[in-house]
Amino acid sequence: MASSNMKDETYYIALNMIQNYIIEYNTNKPRKSFVIDSISYDVLKAACKSVIKTNYNEFDIIISRNIDFNVIVTQVLEDKINWGRIITIIAFCAYYSKKVKQDTSPQYYDGIISEAITDAILSKYRSWFIDQDYWNGIRIYKNYSYIFNTASYCIFTASLIIASLAVFKICSFYM
């Protein structure tokens, strides 16, 4: 996919994180020292790892259908953008590149995929990315995810306690 975006500071900020994550995922060599924002990179890396761990079977099915990754990226980002979609796209493309890069030069392929993701995001959602303060927005996503997971855990625990008390009450009624 030829780049349709102007290659300004915003472009290179977006590309930096995406490209370094994909290279690290494929080589297993740390790339944190090469990124602009190491804290956001850690969040991105952990989130992508989680997405790949839980979705690798689905990713394999998509890859087996021989659908061009550009089409997949475009479809995922077609109607709206959020950090979850960006993370999923980056995770999928990293996984995809590791699976199919045997046919081409690794550095060449990582660059193509990274640029395609960056182009797809910025061609339609450049102002959103800037409004998110670039990669700083992913930190807020992490905090909301943590709050949601904590709330879910608390609700589950409260439900378990209430159910246990109800069972105890019913059992004590029959004794």
Curated annotation (Swiss-Prot):
<feature type="short sequence motif" description="BH1">
    <location>
        <begin position="75"/>
        <end position="94"/>
    </location>
</feature>
<keyword id="KW-0053">Apoptosis</keyword>
<comment type="subunit">
    <text>Interacts with host BAX; this interaction inhibits BAX oligomerization and subsequent activation. Interacts with host BAK1.</text>
</comment>
<keyword id="KW-1081">Inhibition of host apoptosis by viral BCL2-like protein</keyword>
<comment type="function">
    <text>Plays a role in the inhibition of host apoptosis by sequestering and inactivating multiple proapoptotic BCL-2 proteins, including BAK1 and BAX.</text>
</comment>
<dbReference type="GO" id="GO:0033650">
    <property type="term" value="C:host cell mitochondrion"/>
</dbReference>
<dbReference type="InterPro" id="IPR020717">
    <property type="entry name" value="Bcl2_BH1_motif_CS"/>
</dbReference>
<dbReference type="Pfam" id="PF00452">
    <property type="entry name" value="Bcl-2"/>
</dbReference>
<keyword id="KW-0945">Host-virus interaction</keyword>
<dbReference type="InterPro" id="IPR046371">
    <property type="entry name" value="Bcl-2_BH1-3"/>
</dbReference>
<protein>
    <recommendedName>
        <fullName>Apoptosis regulator Bcl-2 homolog</fullName>
    </recommendedName>
</protein>
<keyword id="KW-1045">Host mitochondrion</keyword>
<feature type="short sequence motif" description="BH2">
    <location>
        <begin position="105"/>
        <end position="120"/>
    </location>
</feature>
<dbReference type="InterPro" id="IPR002475">
    <property type="entry name" value="Bcl2-like"/>
</dbReference>
<dbReference type="GO" id="GO:0042981">
    <property type="term" value="P:regulation of apoptotic process"/>
</dbReference>
<comment type="similarity">
    <text>Belongs to the Bcl-2 family.</text>
</comment>
<dbReference type="GO" id="GO:0033668">
    <property type="term" value="P:symbiont-mediated suppression of host apoptosis"/>
</dbReference>
<keyword id="KW-1119">Modulation of host cell apoptosis by virus</keyword>
<dbReference type="InterPro" id="IPR036834">
    <property type="entry name" value="Bcl-2-like_sf"/>
</dbReference>
